[in-house]
């Protein structure tokens, strides 16, 4: 029982009181193997063997630190989103003059996505990624992360100022959205059939729609940002509408996470009523590690979802003040019941293979710190 909140209890279902976003720093052995594979010095099979080995170590460490569900750390990916989206049917990764958003003080590899055919899920390579993770984890619960469907629309149609639709989608954006939602329904069904019961959608579109700067820029290009928010909520709802009752689907909202930098700022208020009030997701992983995320007042629109507070930054290795974190949980509990709140890092530790600016030791100490706080707040 919690001494801080007499009514607070632990959870036995995702999202958990002590949880994670999903990605972890890539070990040096994995970075070396990927580089060697790209140079042709080792085969793809050799790289997969190294990935398997490093994911096995990672899973063991996650169990040791007390996580209730383990991830593969996104060790088989270069980006948190591009690898998945580019492997959809009808989507192609292409070179670009620059990445589709600009991070503070850092440049990302200039790649973007292009829709070249009918969007579908097909026999996506991430199905094998999930199978491998489940095999490594054994009977232990696993969590799997994929980008939200809105990310494909955002990258190809919104950030891209010179979008040229293929004939299939010319003057028919609704068909594109319908095909995209169907692709995700197929994905959810296939992951579920493999045993997945804890799926997370990662989404930076909401971070952009919280930003006054981004909203002004999109408005200047003729985009109705309020309607875009409604479109994305509808797209997500259509994508998850056939979700089985015993499957949890959450969404992580991010403002950018590349080498400890970011690309947008702003509180949740501009999208709160639309997103929190109408999106039928089971839980939200929300960044709240800095002033860039604003206050907790937007949480007043939360209905019966769980809210995982990302109060502990993954962008640096320095530990926060425990009492300050607990006070912020108390603040959030003014808007959402304490038993609808959980705690996690603000984001993953390596949304891209480069990773954030902290050590692996600091990464694990962050998680031990979060577990300790969660036990004080919600009990053991």
What is each PLM-predicted segment?
Residues 2-380:
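Domain-level signal for soluble alpha/beta catalytic cores
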């Amino acid at each position: 029982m919690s001494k801080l909140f007499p009514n607070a209890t632990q959870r036995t279902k995702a999202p958990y009181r002590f949880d994670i976003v999903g990605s972890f720093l890539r070990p040096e052995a994995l970075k070396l193997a990927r580089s060697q594979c790209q140079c042709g010095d080792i085969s793809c099979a050799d790289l997969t063997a190294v990935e398997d080995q490093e994911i096995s170590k990672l899973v063991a460490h996650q169990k040791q630190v007390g996580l209730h569900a383990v991830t593969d750390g996104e060790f088989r990916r270069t980006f948190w989103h591009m690898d998945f989206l580019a492997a959809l049917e009808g989507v192609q990764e292409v070179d670009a003059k620059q990445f589709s958003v600009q991070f503070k003080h850092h440049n990302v590899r200039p790649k973007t996505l292009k829709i070249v055919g009918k969007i579908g899920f097909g026999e996506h390579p991430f199905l094998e990624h999930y199978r491998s993770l489940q095999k490594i984890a054994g009977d232990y619960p696993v969590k799997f992360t994929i980008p939200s469907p809105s990310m494909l629309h955002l990258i190809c149609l919104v950030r891209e100022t010179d979008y040229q639709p293929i004939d299939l989608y010319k003057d028919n954006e609704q068909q594109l959205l319908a095909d995209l939602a169907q692709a995700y329904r197929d994905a959810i069904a296939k992951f579920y059939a493999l045993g997945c019961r804890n799926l997370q959608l990662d989404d930076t579109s909401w971070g952009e729609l919280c930003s006054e700067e981004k909203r002004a820029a999109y408005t200047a290009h003729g985009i109705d940002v309020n309607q875009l928010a409604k479109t994305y909520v509808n797209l997500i709802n259509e994508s998850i509408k056939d979700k089985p009752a015993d499957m949890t689907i959450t969404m992580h909202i991010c403002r950018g996470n590349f080498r400890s930098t970011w690309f947008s700022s702003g509180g949740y208020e501009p999208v709160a009523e639309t997103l929190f009030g109408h999106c039928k997701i089971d839980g939200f992983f929300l960044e709240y590690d800095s002033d860039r995320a604003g206050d907790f007042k937007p949480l007043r629109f939360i209905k019966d979802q769980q809210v995982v507070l990302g109060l502990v930054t993954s962008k640096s290795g320095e530990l926060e003040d425990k009492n300050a974190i607990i006070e912020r949980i108390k603040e959030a509990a003014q808007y959402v019941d304490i038993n609808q709140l959980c705690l996690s890092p603000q984001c993953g530790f390596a949304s891209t293979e480069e990773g954030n600016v902290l050590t692996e030791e600091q990464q694990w100490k962050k998680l031990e710190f979060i577990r300790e706080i969660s036990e004080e707040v919600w009990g053991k």
